[in-house]
């Protein structure tokens, strides 16, 4: 393997990332339904603060991460017991020396951006999630222009190491490989962090610096997509409205049609 730059700084950072439940103090009447596909229901939840950014690679506040976890899906997720399990990845292997992690992506994961806001999936509004999306996400984490708060990323941010030299590469469109400088028992679970979620480079560039800052600059690859983001700095009627993302295979699971 030619790429063997340090990913341990990423692992250290992500170990400190925590997640929040979707809802605090809200009622869930539809859970009384014994048989339902979840459609037609609206799940309402309250956040302690307004999300500052829905960019997985730069969001640091708890409110933002709560929304991000519903809009995006990474390689790994935490189950109800806090244990890591595969999400967008079909399987993975670890080399005998513990330095190489290879993930095979599921083929039924897609990005969706409702460009005309009609809640209909047009052919040009969805595209495949690929290994390159994860590579670009990790490059953004370490890119000096991102002004990341990552610990131990000084070498990259100072320009001594180019973001492209980070130890992650796309072997193919569906195979992603990480190279570590030393074994890290926490690396797999740290991939459940929001920062490790994919980023579509083409869409990112189209947002012209607005990525994750408003409804029109968010493309979803998770269970829901962003339908409305009303944000008033001086008011208390702020609202985020998400709809179930039908292009994602997770739509087969039981959950409500809408979140607000």
Feature-to-residue mapping (PLM):
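Bacterial N-terminal signal peptides that target proteins for export
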Residues: 2-12
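C-terminal motif of bacterial Sec signal peptides marking the signal peptidase cleavage site
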Residues: 21-25
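Bacterial signal peptide processing site
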Residues: 27-29
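Short, well-ordered beta-strand elements
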Residues: 39-49, 100-103, 134, 176-177, ...
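N-terminal lobe/hinge region of extracytoplasmic solute-binding protein
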Residues: 46-96, 219-221
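Aromatic- and charge-enriched surface segment that lines or borders ligand/interaction sites
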Residues: 90-148
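Surface-exposed binding/hinge segments that line
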Residues: 132-133, 140-142, 146-203
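Gly/Pro-rich hinge or "lid" segments in bacterial periplasmic/extracellular proteins
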Residues: 173, 184-258
């Amino acid at each position: 393997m030619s790429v063997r730059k340090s990913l341990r700084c990423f692992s250290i950072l992500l170990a400190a990332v925590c997640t929040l439940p979707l809802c605090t103090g809200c009622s869930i009447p539809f859970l009384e339904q014994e048989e339902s596909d979840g459609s037609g229901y609206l799940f309402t939840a309250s956040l302690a603060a307004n999300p500052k950014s829905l960019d997985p690679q730069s969001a640091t506040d708890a409110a933002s991460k709560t929304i991000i976890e519903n809009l995006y899906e990474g390689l790994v997720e935490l189950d109800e017991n806090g244990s890591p399990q595969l999400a967008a990845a079909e399987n993975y292997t670890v080399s005998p020396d513990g330095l190489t992690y290879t993930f095979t992506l599921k083929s039924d994961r897609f990005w969706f951006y409702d460009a005309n806001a009609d809640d209909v999936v047009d052919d040009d509004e969805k595209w495949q999630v690929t290994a390159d999306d994860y590579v670009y996400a990790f490059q953004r984490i370490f890119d000096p222009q991102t002004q990341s708060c990552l610990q131990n990323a000084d070498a990259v941010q100072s320009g001594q190491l180019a973001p492209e030299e980070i130890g992650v590469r796309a072997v193919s469109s569906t195979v992603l490989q990480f190279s570590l400088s030393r074994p890290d028992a926490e690396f797999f679970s740290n991939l459940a962090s929001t920062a490790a979620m994919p980023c579509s480079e083409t869409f990112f560039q189209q947002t012209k610096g607005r990525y994750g800052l408003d409804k029109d600059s968010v493309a979803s690859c998770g269970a829901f997509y962003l339908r409305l983001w009303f944000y008033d700095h001086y008011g208390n009627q702020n609202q985020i409205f998400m709809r179930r993302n039908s292009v994602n295979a997770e739509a087969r699971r039981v959950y409500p049609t809408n979140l607000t």
